[in-house]
Amino acid sequence: MELLDSPAPLRPLHDNPRLPKADGAQKRLSVERIYQKKTQLEHILLRPDTYIGSVETVTQQMWVFDEDVGLNCRDVTFVPGLYKIFDEILVNAADNKQRDKSMSCIKVTIDPENNTISVWNNGKGIPVVEHKVEKVYVPALIFGQLLTSSNYDDDEKKVTGGRNGYGAKLCNIFSTKFTVETACREYKKLFKQTWTDNMGKAGEMTLKHFDGEDYTCVTFQPDLSKFKMTILDKDIVALMSRRAYDIAGSTKDVKVFLNGKRLPVKGFRSYVDLYLKDKVDETGNALKVIHEEVNSRWEVCLTLSEKGFQQVSFVNSIATTKGGRHVDYVADQIVTKLIDVVKKKNKNGVGVKPFQVKNHMWIFVNSLIENPTFDSQTKENMTLQAKSFGSTCKLSEKFIKGAVGCGIVESILNWVKFKAQTQLNKKCSAVKHTKIKGVPKLDDANDAGSKNSIDCTLILTEGDSAKTLAVSGLGVVGRDKYGVFPLRGKMLNVREASHKQIMENAEINNIIKIVGLQYKKNYEDRESLKSLRYGKIMIMTDQDQDGSHIKGLLINFIHHNWPSLLRHNFLEEFITPIIKVSKNKEEIPFYSIPEFEEWKSSTQNYNSWKIKYYKGLGTSTSKEAKEYFADMARHRIGFKYSGPEDDAAITLAFSKKKVEERKEWLTNFMEDRRQRNVHGLPEDYLYGKDTNYLTYNDFINKELVLFSNSDNERSIPSLVDGLKPGQRKVLFTCFKRNDKREVKGAQLAGSVAEMSSYHHGEASLMMTIINLAQNFVGSNNLNLLQPIGQFGTRLHGGKDSASPRYIFTMLSPLARLLFPPVDDNVLRFLYDDNQRVEPEWYMPIIPMVLINGAEGIGTGWSCKIPNFDIRETVNNIRCLLDGKEPLPMLPSYKNFKGTIDELGPNQYVISGEVSILDSTTIEITELPVRTWTQTYKEQVLEPMLNGTEKTPPLITDYKEYHTDTTVKFVVKMSEEKLAEAEAVGLHKVFKLQTNLTCNSMVLFDHVGFLKKYESPQDILKEFFELRLRYYGLRKEWLIGMLGAESAKLNNQARFILEKIDGKIVIENKPKKELIQVLIQRGYESDPVKAWKELQNKEEEEGDESGEESAAATGPDFNYLLNMPLWYLTKEKKDELCKQRDNKDKELEDLKHKSPSDLWKEDLAAFVEELDAVEAKQMQDEMAGITGKPLKVKGGKQGGKQKVTKAQLAEVMPSPHGIRVVPRVTAEMKAEAEKRIKKKIKSEKNESDEKQEGNSSGDKEPSSLKQRLAQKRKAEQGTKRQTTLPFKPIKKMKRNPWSDSESDSESDDFEVPSKRERVVRQAAAKIKPMVNSDSDADLTSSDEDSEYQENSEGNTDSDTTSKKKPPKAKAVPKEKKGKAPKEKPLPDAVPVRVQNVAAESASQDPAAPPVSVPRAQAVPKKPAAAKKGSTAKDNQPSIMDILTKKKAAPKAPRRAQREESPPSEATAAVAKKPGPPRGRKATKRLTSSSDSDSDFGSRPSKSVAAKKSKRDDDDSYSIDLTADSPAAAAPRTRPGRLKKPVQYLESSDEDDMF
């Protein structure tokens, strides 16, 4: 019983019939049913979807081939499993092409009536031979037994479609009858066998002898019942037919027959055409196909898709209908290139992402891939990673160019516009609301959005303060019809703004919301205007140029989006007075400066009126606001549309495409203004008393043009002094303050704003001050202010400067030598708010625009000028003074140790320094100019160390040894990588070369006209002509002033002598009688005072009351009668007579000097001080390193010095490094030529060309070792060469320049010595300055006559001097006599000439000398070599260079030192007594400046005294003995040395306005 009860699964059922069915028995049976084992054949039939896909019918869109239509995409109902088994047989046939290239034909026959399909192919058949292991013939094995294949060897790289060993067997299994016939010539047998019943029964195999061509034919009858079908319907036949076409297109050189007809497909390209017939793009043109057969394994076609991303692709003849990684691999390459093009063309539109670009592509890919993998047996999606493809598909430039032009880009751009419009429309409300929320600071009109909204006006104000003014005025006109909204600063230029900017711009969105505007709505009639919340916009801005710009931007905003609104006079402006004059209770407002000037010239006693300037709307009071709104007719000016010329004017002002037209517009304006000045005509102005409306054309051409011009004036410097207005204001203030002590940057900024009437933010002013004082490499070559504190370094390009609250500055000792105080008297000073401010331009003794360079972007023009060497420039001026042509100049940056080579006209390549230490280490010791250390580290070395997604790591490590002034990276890399990098060019690989293009040398000339210069020589020549003329004016002024002082001393001496002799008795006599006596005896009224009054009559008339003026015109003998009694003593009498004689002699000496002599004296004094300053800088830099050991408690000096030497070695270049010479190749020069041509074409761009990326290196095959050997030979061979080399070989000093001063001073000035071009003669430059009708000329001609009159002692000519005030008066009273002794001058000039000659004779690049000493050329040459050797000669060791630096220059420097003390003495602070003082006495113009109260002061009076005298701006006495006060100050503060600084990089503050 136990046995009967126990579960016995093997017991027959009839053996225990009486056994009751219990729950346990049910469970037993379910276990058997649940857990079953099937054979593989059963499994395939039971679960077909695992192997062949679904056996249920599906309906989806597919490409099919219909007899009547051809290839088309339509909804198809088919069974994927049936489609797949057919496809397996077809792909097997195509695979045979990869095994046998001679295969040429495939025949596909589909017989729906008989439910029979056959695929026949020629080419090598299946081996008809018995398999020795399986003991069965191979065809029977691979077609009739599962898990058999020839594709299982993954070590064998195959490009066939078969992969898993299922394909043909699956077709056999799902067929009622499956026949294989194959003929094998090799085995001379024909094999044939048939399987039936889903491969359940194998028929008898037949073998026959065969001697023909190989072939294989598979014929099968699908088991339609397994697919729930009864016949092969139209859809499945159409799908199979398309696969036949696929094979014809994807298999090369194979004819495909379908049902006996050959398919008309001759390759992949013609196959693609089947898809595109009758397809057109958006414009109705046939789609353009770009085709490329990349290599034997890849063929790609591309065209435009109008319904998302489409792809037709094949992997080894398999149709990958879902794509895969092979499609992504190709598509991503195309997308990357297209997206760059789209971004360029769509800078301002909606951001475009890669998938959005892809959505416009239709791509066709035919590929052969080794051992491909798929995500399923259905093989619709290829999953193999690209790195395993076994081949690459790099699309050519030609293909990419075609892709850009085939319509895809245009389609994307159209889509972008559509999307942008859609997004913008979401910002607008289509319904008019009476109340709106979420707009802060809006004071809405009560009727806005109501039925009366068309009568409402929205007042847009410039800032909150202006809103307050408008709200005050609303008290008069009421709030029902007027709303107010303040704008924050300037509006966006929507014409050129990006879509993102417009979408995110709160100002624009708020205005649209407040007014109720809708994008793309056409406001053609009055009805459409009623849909708006406001019927008008009134613009209320300051009456300055920035206010005009805001008005223009608002007009542009409306015109760009809703041009029809302008025709409805939708816009108005509210004007307020710029100036009000009042007298008693009468008040006159003026709405423009020219109108005020007209009134002034026509009103005799205008001085008696109170004049008030209104700088902005904030100046007006609430009471005045109410007055403005009460007289709405006068203050409300409507904009009136006058026709197409208005549209053209607005577009001209704001469109990016109108750059050239804008240049012409501004040029015409400048010329018109100049002509008006020349002819004394008033400026044109808009707002007269009767002005009620304004056309847009008038607004643009008469008001907005003033802003555009002022934008240029603020952004582009003057040729004369190289300064922008903000910088000039800083300099003016520093000259006027004449600080003896350093001053905080923030305090100086406040002082500038006060003294020079600066109207912009002080933050930008502080940046200007910082920029003027910076002296790191790549900034200024000559900083006009001293950087006392952290003003920025080359580590961050100056961005690491400390807050202006913490840093100090003061004038550089060189500033007043560059801008001599005596020249201030002949400059034309400007007036702002009736306050005398800075001059139109200063007049330096050298062109500062070349020394410190310039950079700025204005309206229509941009400016970019590199820095040039100070001494080269000085020598060129001396050449011009001697009647010679200036030598060509290369850009030069102070303390830059790299090289600058010329590639073409105004095209240069700047190279850093790199040397090789050993086979795995290089050392970078200089970066290209304006490549900042930190930026280089982050953007170049870090990616090289860590690698990026696209590039593997190149270096293994780097170490940093920089200081704030030097660069040193020691970089480690593998030997192989270093060899590769060296072959390409280390400068190229490590991005140590940048291009400098100077095709935008645009400057304001001396008459305020923008002019483009072709070369630095052109700038130099124009400056030279003007400066020489101003030396003539200076001489005339000095002759007049000295004549007056001489007359005064003569009168004083005669008066004393006559008093002593008793000829004049003054005791106990009335003053009137004394004056009468003096007049009778021929004494003049105070000559100095009279001369000054003559010079300043116009200014005095403006500043003083009528009564004071009258008093000043009477005779003044106080200069005689106020002399102290002790002047009657013998000593004082003799001293006075001596002063008189000295003054006469000084005057005579001056008369004998030519303007050229005066200039040469100034240059000599400047160069002497420059030497002293640079020597001091060098000394400070070396302090603590090579100089005195630092004091440490308990430390020994010796030990300390060792430490400092170690420190020095650490930051200095390694002595063992082999310098790598920068390559300047023909390829780089060709690139430069291309850039020039491109520049000519693209001159329409507003912004100037920026420094371009790294240049490519040459393709020299030689290794470093070979190249160095060749280089050494070449250098030795060319050492004496006297002809100009044609290929830049290495780093050297400036070529024609052998400057004595630079020698003594050091390695700072390294300039490539070889010039590849012959001296360029500047095309005869226009010299408008000589006979120009500018204001300056008119002024100077007046001065000439005046000087002559004064020199003769005439004092009656006050009335003739109307035009003199601005120029005649000098801020400082004392003229700085800076002429050095006669001795140094001859020294300097001839030696320079000799040096130029000497060096031009040996202009060979290999010549070591950097420059030639002032005294003896021969001994100095070796010293100079210190620099050159590093750069050029046989790669000497750094140690040699260092010893040369230390030893060789020492002696010459000492010799120089003996001459230089006088220059130090001239620095007014007289800290060092002794020898320096001797120099002072020999200054060229010695005279003590006499004032009314101190006529007997001695010539030798201390500098401090003289300086204090200059502090008084109204004191006009001139002490020609005194050294420049500015020069003096530095002597007290010797610590700060100047380095090249330029305000270019961070651009002057003016650019920020």
Curated annotation (Swiss-Prot):
Residues 1-25, 1095-1114, 1186-1553 are annotated as: Disordered. Mg(2+) 2 binds at D542, D544. Mg(2+) 1 binds at E462, D542. The keyword Iron does not apply. GO terms for biological process: apoptotic chromosome condensation; cell division; chromosome segregation; DNA damage response; DNA replication; DNA topological change; positive regulation of apoptotic process; resolution of meiotic recombination intermediates. The record marks K490, N493, R662, K663, K724, Y758, S764, W932 as: Interaction with DNA. Residues 1444-1454 have a biased composition (Basic residues). InterPro entries: DNA_Topoisomerase_II, DTHCT, HATPase_C_sf, Ribosomal_Su5_D2-typ_SF, Ribsml_uS5_D2-typ_fold_subgr, Topo_IIA, Topo_IIA-like_dom_sf, Topo_IIA_A/C_ab. Residues 343-345, 991-1000 are annotated as: Interaction with DNA. The active site is at Y806 (o-(5'-phospho-dna)-tyrosine intermediate). Residues 456-573 form the Toprim domain. Its cofactor is Mg(2+); Mn(2+); Ca(2+). Signal peptide: none annotated. Residues 1413-1432, 1517-1532 have a biased composition (Low complexity). The keyword Magnesium applies. Eukaryotic topoisomerase I and II can relax both negative and positive supercoils, whereas prokaryotic enzymes relax only negative supercoils. Belongs to the type II topoisomerase family. This is DNA topoisomerase 2-alpha. It comes from Gallus gallus (Chicken).
